[in-house]
Amino acid sequence: MNRRRGKIDEKLFLDSEMKGISLIKGGNDYDYCVRLFLDDLELKNLAFHTRRWHRENLHHFKQMLLKLNLPTEPINIAEGNIKQCILHWKRESNLSPTTINHRIRSMKQMYNFLSNEGIVNQIPIAKVEKLKSPQVIIRPFEESEIHGLLRQPDKSSFIGYRDYTIMLVLLDTGVRLIELENMQLSNIDFNDNKILVMGKGAKEREVMFQGTTRLYLQRYLRLRGSLDHDYLWINIMGTKLNRNSVQDRLRFYGKQANLKGVRVSPHTFRHTCAKMYIMRGGDILSLQKLLGHSSLEMVRHYVDLWGSDLQQMHKKFSPVESLFRNG
């Protein structure tokens, strides 16, 4: 029987790694590499939906490689193989540039991880650029449209009252859908009218609400009652309300209100919150913090979008016009 040495020779590890043992085990198995990458994202505490998003993107890449009879082993995939996948999606599948770019982004992140771990020696996607995509402009709600939406929920029922309150929270705080979905009862501070939410990149931030939203939130909590979990938004069974249900309910109210030319979604509420905040004199620095943007780029984009509205606002509140009008 071969006995293990009493003392470990660390050179054994170094020699094995230099000879590429990890390349043989991992680099030849696409699914194994994806699993390692997703595990690393989990260790970095990235949200479940983010990990699922990457998994789906990487799955689509593998399926296309198989369809085109191209190598699927990460150590054998070449830059040309990746470009073939992209061209097929663009020409044959007619996918949007945004969807294709999402897949490119996931593949790049996985290869960067594999390279850092020594599982691959080259990053074939390193020089592959994202596709140019048209900027999608999300039209905010007009005030009349907001009133139309708020008239739809039946506030005499639990579902209607919950949905009405959700719309107020979306409009008042500008939170993302995932942030709304994961709101915790214990993170609401009614003394200072704020809610602690978990934003992108597992970054916490506080969002604010005011008197009307506070009133409906407190009443909703009485309807919600005491449960064995801390999630704020629930369905009639008392379990956590999922994001698909929120989106479906909002679309339903949009149809009931007969809204045309505007997407009725949580993200439209977010854009509407941003616009109304700016139009009522809010500054972009505080808006950036409230919305959880990592830079001012997106907030500046909001201002650019609503230039004509700002012109009307300046016409109404011009310092010089006001001075001479009152003088």
Regions found by a protein language model. Give the residues of each.
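Conserved catalytic core of the tyrosine transesterase superfamily
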Residues: 1-327
